[in-house]
Regions:
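Conserved glycine(s) of the Walker
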Residues: 13
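NTP-dependent small-molecule kinase module
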Residues: 16, 20, 24, 69, ...
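Short glycine-rich anion-binding loops that position phosphate/pyrophosphate groups of nucleotides
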Residues: 77-80, 102-104, 144
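ATP-dependent small-molecule kinase phosphotransfer cores
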Residues: 34-81, 85-91
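Post-Walker A helix-loop "phosphate-sensing" segment adjacent to the P-loop in P-loop NTPases
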Residues: 23-32
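P-loop (Walker A) phosphate-binding loop of NTP-binding proteins
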Residues: 9
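Hydrophobic anchor at the beta1->P-loop junction of P-loop NTPases
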Residues: 6
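A glycine- and Lys/Arg-enriched "phosphate-lid" helix/loop adjacent to the NTP-binding pocket
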Residues: 93-130
Length: 164
């Protein structure tokens, strides 16, 4: 059974949608950022104390572990798809869904790389193409979680190559 992996900007709703999809589809979900925090502490502290490269290495390590599983839902960190190895890991057995949320609705508090709207706009410009290139499905996130979930479920159902 294929995995479902959610990608997108920080705070676009990946963790929330992974949890809701998990409930609807009766699948276990893994949040790569949460797994990193359980092992290493808060992400902003990792960035300050050990640097972004150390964090990205942890991200790859955790993704390698979870992507060996099947039939799960993976909520990735916003920067996970930036590394080619991570893109390859996601694509090897996952239906990748890009959650595209309006930049003005993204949270900035507690996010080491997205401190304000200007930073988010720059980040979006750098990452949007990567997210689009890696994804099988793109969902425009709206503020109503249930409606967004319904859109995701409908797109999964309609995706011709997906084995549930």
């Amino acid at each position: 059974m294929e995995n479902i992996a959610l990608v997108g900007m920080p705070s676009c709703g990946k963790t929330t949608m992974a949890r809701l999809l998990s409930e609807k589809l009766n699948r276990v979900y893994y949040d790569t950022d949460k797994l990193i925090e359980e092992r290493e502490g808060k992400i902003p502290e990792i960035f300050v104390n050990k640097g972004e490269k150390y964090f990205r290495d942890l991200e790859t390590k955790v993704l390698k572990e979870v992507s060996k599983k099947t039939g799960i839902i993976i909520a990735t960190g916003g920067g996970t798809p930036l590394r080619e190895i991570n893109r390859d890991l996601l694509l090897q057995n996952s239906l990748v869904i890009y959650l595209d949320r309006d930049i003005k609705n993204l949270e900035t508090e507690g996010r080491p790389l997205s401190k304000n709207l200007e930073t988010l706009e720059k980040m979006y410009g750098e990452r949007n193409k990567i997210y689009q290139d890696i994804s099988h499905i793109k969902i425009k996130v709206i503020e109503d979680e249930e409606k967004t979930l319904e859109k995701i479920l409908e797109e999964i159902k309609n995706y011709e190559n997906f084995s549930n």
